[in-house]
Amino acid sequence: MSAKSAISKEIFAPLDERMLGAVQVKRRTKKKIPFLATGGQGEYLTYICLSVTNKKPTQASITKVKQFEGSTSFVRRSQWMLEQLRQVNGIDPNRDSAEFDLLFENAFDQWVASTASEKCTFFQILHHTCQRYLTDRKPEFINCQSKIMGGNSILHSAADSVTSAVQKASQALNERGERLGRAEEKTEDMKNSAQQFAETAHKLAMKHKC
């Protein structure tokens, strides 16, 4: 099981939440943590996770999850409601960059994702979630590449694929309906021709009989 699947199962599923995406990060400025109970300073992995509740009305949140060295479990650390997110800074709109900043009402973090592509995927999901679930005040996305905001995102591509499939299916049904319609018209014409032939034959038979 991947780390993200394990986080979804351990952290969010028990609370009836659904994890939409996650990105593994490190602070751009190294920040020490307090000594652990064992007396030593712990190394850890950090994940920024985006989730929504399964119950209506849907609430979205961003959660910081950590996994300490030597442990197989994950720990929920900080959490913010999506409404508290004020700004998402992609740092450089002209190139793939793993760096980004998140500004909340009461917190500001500077991160480096494990890869630029992982950051890009998380940003696409985050932007889509903000557009879908936030109606009033949406966070500002600055210094982000156009593929995050525009039609090249994986979410838009998936939507386009579904739309294309529906359009193709609809077109196929329309063409089939047209073929059936033409067949029905042809059958009706043949029926009328047969009736006319029968009437003509009947008239000829009556004429010769007379």
From Swiss-Prot:
Residues 151-210 form the v-SNARE coiled-coil homology domain. The keyword Membrane applies. GO terms for cellular component: cytoplasm; membrane. SUPFAM superfamilies: SNARE fusion complex. It comes from the Eukaryota. Keywords: Acetylation, Coiled coil, Cytoplasm, Membrane. The keyword Transferase does not apply. The modification N-acetylserine is found at S2. Forms non-fusogenic complexes with SNAP25 and STX1A and may thereby modulate the formation of functional SNARE complexes and exocytosis. This is Syntaxin-binding protein 6. It comes from Mus musculus (Mouse). The gene is Stxbp6.
